[in-house]
């Protein structure tokens, strides 16, 4: 008898894609299909086999295959896109637009063909614009095309807060709004340590420094690595979102969602709090923003639109 499990396809078998595939399998969330270009089919198969051979040791039951044939992804419950060129030191996210938008269109055509009912999560940078590109190419309802940045940016923010206070990261909550770039908006006012507002625990000077470090978080890792970009935390963030969808958890998470008037913006993808469940984005949550917070979000939106103009 064949075991019927959920199915997740991960497009792009680089560091982030492969790590995502392994974490998905370890958590037994789904069978995993890891996909890359034909020239990299054997290395992709090798990575998948290596992961599968870890299953007896790690104690998980999940099938993992590597392939370059999108037919193997057919009827995926979730498809995660990590494919694209990597960000290099000194490279702005804007520099990635031309090449990665072409990759998105090519990949999305295959996804829509083989898994017309799937939910797509996009990681490829610049992720706000790439998610919009995938949305337009796929022709899916907006709820089923989602970008990942807020979970990652918020994780970085929570990490730095926990370090500052010498507390468990489990006790730190927070939200980061806006585009995935230097103009993102960590909302200190909606962030807490064990239910206590951060503003009562950390000085404004230190909070400002933590906010700035969060904004530069991706670049900090790029510069430290010297080659490539972060992949452990991005992969973990993708898995958290995927789990919320597959298990219909209706989690309140920050995600890149298509806006149609929420927060006063239209026809763009932007990082906002959402309810994430079995149908994808179940609802966009609108927070009340102070004037300075709304102005910061306006600046972030302007940055996102500037990148989107390159697409058009």
UniProtKB/Swiss-Prot annotation:
Gene3D superfamilies: Lactate dehydrogenase/glycoside hydrolase, family 4, C-terminal, NAD(P)-binding Rossmann-like Domain. GO terms for molecular function: L-lactate dehydrogenase activity; L-malate dehydrogenase (NAD+) activity. NAD(+) binds at residues 12-17, 36, 100, 123-125. Keywords: NAD, Oxidoreductase, Phosphoprotein, Tricarboxylic acid cycle. It catalyses: (S)-malate + NAD(+) = oxaloacetate + NADH + H(+). Its EC number is 1.1.1.37. InterPro entries: L-lactate/malate_DH, Lactate/malate_DH_C, Lactate/malate_DH_N, Lactate_DH/Glyco_Ohase_4_C, Malate_DH_type3, NAD(P)-bd_dom_sf. It is an enzyme of class 1 (oxidoreductase). GO terms for biological process: lactate metabolic process; tricarboxylic acid cycle. It comes from the Bacteria. PANTHER family: L-2-HYDROXYCARBOXYLATE DEHYDROGENASE (NAD(P)(+)), L-LACTATE DEHYDROGENASE. NCBIfam families: MalateDH_bact, PRK06223.1. Catalyzes the reversible oxidation of malate to oxaloacetate. This is Malate dehydrogenase.
């Amino acid at each position: 008898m064949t075991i019927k499990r959920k199915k997740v396809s991960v497009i792009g078998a680089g560091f982030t894609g492969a790590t995502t595939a392994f974490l998905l399998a370890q958590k037994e969330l789904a069978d995993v299909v890891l996909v890359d270009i034909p020239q990299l089919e054997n290395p992709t198969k090798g990575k998948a086999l290596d992961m599968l051979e870890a299953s007896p040791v790690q104690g998980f039951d999940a099938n993992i295959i590597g392939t370059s044939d999108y037919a193997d992804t057919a009827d995926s419950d979730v498809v995660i896109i990590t494919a694209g060129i990597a960000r290099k030191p000194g490279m702005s996210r804007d520099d990635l637009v031309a090449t990665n938008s072409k990759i998105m269109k090519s990949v999305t055509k295959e996804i829509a063909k083989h898994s017309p009912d799937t939910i797509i999560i996009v990681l490829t940078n610049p992720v706000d614009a790439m998610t919009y590109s995938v949305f337009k190419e796929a022709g899916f309802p907006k709820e089923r095309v989602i970008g990942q940045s807020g979970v990652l940016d918020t994780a970085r923010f929570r990490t730095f807060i926990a370090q500052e206070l010498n507390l468990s990261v489990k006790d730190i909550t927070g939200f980061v709004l806006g585009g995935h770039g230097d103009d993102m908006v960590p909302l200190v006012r909606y962030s807490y340590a064990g239910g206590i507002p951060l503003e009562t625990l950390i000085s404004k000077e230190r909070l400002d420094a933590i906010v700035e470090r969060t904004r530069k978080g991706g670049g900090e890792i790029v510069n430290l690595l010297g080659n490539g970009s972060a992949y452990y935390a991005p992969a973990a963030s993708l898995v958290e979102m995927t789990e919320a969808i597959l298990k219909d958890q209706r989690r309140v998470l920050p995600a890149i969602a298509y806006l149609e008037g929420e927060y006063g913006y239209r026809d763009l993808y932007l990082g906002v709090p959402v309810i994430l469940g079995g149908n994808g984005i179940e609802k966009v949550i609108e927070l009340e923003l102070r004037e300075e917070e709304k102005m910061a979000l306006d600046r972030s939106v302007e940055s996102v639109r500037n990148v989107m103009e390159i697409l058009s």
